[in-house]
Amino acid sequence: MPVTINGNGSITGLSVGGLGSGVVNTASIADGAVTTDKASGSVKGIEMVDQWRITSTKSNSGQSVFDSNWERNDLNSNKIGSAGMSESSGVFTFPTTGKYLVIAFGYATGNNDRYMGIWIERTADGSNWTRGAEGYGSAYNSGSNTFSQVSIQYFFHVTNTSTHKIRLKSDNVGTCNWDGAQDIMRTGFTFIRMGDA
């Protein structure tokens, strides 16, 4: 079929892939002609944001995984995107592959504790856990109910949602309380999908 340029400016007879290399450049593409299906990496923008917290205070000494009492922050409909994170026994699963910024934060009270910290732990095989980030505060004071706040970040490249997972762990020299609540963010996670894997 011959290629025909019609009087109204339309073209008929042109097959898919029929234009040679360099015929169409970026400047000639209409502003609304590129869909997210054709975009890649961070060009799509942020596609997912999700925030989770513990709902009750966790009291422990030494190292301990935050394995219960998690809920999504439901006060401000904070989840962006159709699919957010899922959680089971403190282990968080990502909805899709991609590059994620993981932010963990903890609010603790202690009594003469030299250090109280949190770790972002990651696994790439679903079973072996290693530290991705850690941060510490201190409640080294002779009085009781000394407060400490810790915030850490980790950039996680998720290539397999079945094996790449995240969890939160505490590390304290003595017994301290990591505060949780149902109506305010005190101890928990924020997950932001920054781009494609």
Question: Where are the regions a protein language model picked out?
Answer:
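Extracellular jelly-roll beta-sandwich "head" domains, especially the C-terminal globular C1q domain
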Residues: 44-197
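Glycine-rich, low-complexity segments
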Residues: 2-69, 194-197
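Short, functional N-terminal and low-complexity linear motifs
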Residues: 1, 6, 131-135
